[in-house]
Amino acid sequence: GLIFDEAYYWYFAQNLSWGYFDHPPMVAFLVNLGINIFDGELGVRLASPFLYAANVFLLWQLIETDKKYKYTWLFMAFVSSIGLMVAYGFMILPDTALLTFSLLFVWAYKRFLLKKDTISVLVLGFSMAAVMYCKYHGILLIGFVLLSNLALLKNSKFWMATAISLVLYTPHLVWLYQVDFAPLKYHLFDRANSAYRIKFTLDYLVNCIAVAGLCFPLMYFAFYKLPSKDKFDKALKFLGYGVFLFFLF
């Protein structure tokens, strides 16, 4: 059956809006799309396997070397070992779409570094808006990539992509203004309902291991050991360390 959170988002999907009390509308849009095609749990979760397939495709596209065709089996084994990613292949949560559009953003940024053509600008702009429509945490993804390459601030094509993302995100910004920014106030000030305990940090560290699945030793060792060869690698390092430290503290 559906977990509690999925039932909560099903309730969102009954009345589509440009925003909800504690979330942007992406998850509600996806659930609404599914339940208009199928009834029950199948409809609620319909988008999840398609997003999972997109995740696998985008990860494959992010691998540059031609050697990947020789080790397709290893790639599939590695992807299948990431438990949380597999779970998002059938559960519909805000993080389900956030993962997909985060990968799209990373792919678009990589392409943007190689060639700043119209496609790169459009996809980069769209993906920035999409991650923000999934969760407000999407700003971390955009922010840490920007911090890794401040020269983007002098790039007119990057500002074009930013303008596109803002235009696409305007309906939600207007909605936020209309509700006096209640979701932001909730996340920033009202959500914490208990004093800090060391258990919170320990649980977070355990979750960091669980998220990586069975390959966590290899994944974290490679992340720490491999040097940054270019701006894209540097962005990945900033994302990894930045997100980890942000939620740690």
Tell where the protein language model's regions lie, with residue ranges.
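Transmembrane-helix motifs of polytopic, lipid-linked glycan transferases
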Residues: 46-68, 104-108
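Short acidic/glycine- and proline-prone juxtamembrane loop motifs at membrane-interface regions
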Residues: 87-98
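Membrane-interface alpha helices of multi-pass inner-membrane proteins
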Residues: 15, 120-135, 146-147, 164-167, ...
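Specific aromatic-rich, kink-prone transmembrane helix
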Residues: 58, 78, 97-114, 120-128
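Transmembrane-helix signature of polytopic, membrane-embedded enzymes
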Residues: 59-81, 99-100
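Membrane-interface transmembrane helices that cradle and orient dolichyl/undecaprenyl
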Residues: 64-69, 105-121, 222-228
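Short helix- or helix-capping micro-motifs
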Residues: 72-83, 128, 132, 146
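Transmembrane-lumen/periplasm boundary regions of multi-pass, lipid-linked membrane glycan transferases
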Residues: 141-233
